[in-house]
């Protein structure tokens, strides 16, 4: 219901007046909106002046959706975004949970850091249990899966390339909670949709951005520059 309709309803219910609770709610929304606008201006000048860590940090985000619960059923949770959406397109499956989002972002941070078009990452409980670089799409997935097929069961697969029909058929052989692709062939989606509860995510709009990483603990925030270094095969050594 828009503010106008809420006001009309309030006036009708209170004989031309408004209740204290309504006025407090309107004050909350008004000051939140102006504070968000001021935060945008503040962050513009912080970026313009290249100030890494200002004396006061103002963060403004938008509610994307309220989630069923948090990491555990007794926790309440929501997801917010610096823009108006997460840029994740869900093509199929049940609604994403807090743990799904947590795993998805862990998987994307890893897969997007690999050379484009060849990287596959499998994540379980926000930790990678398989990573592969291979120009052959099916080969890339199979190598990642072979790293730890037991842990991979029920996990999340993130491919930094377009998923084709051959790979979709291979992915369907193992139970996964979420499949993330940088786009999909139509026939690939058709095959994956045969798994009713599988969440299919298109991440083609997601890019590694220069946004600080923030972790909250008690009354403090740990803030650091993003870990968006690109890795290549030459960066790794087999030591045993």
Label every PLM stretch briefly:
Residues 1-3:
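Short, small-residue-biased leader/transition segments that mark boundaries at the very start
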Residues 6-49, 55-59:
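Cofactor-pocket helix-loop regions in the catalytic cores of large enzyme subunits
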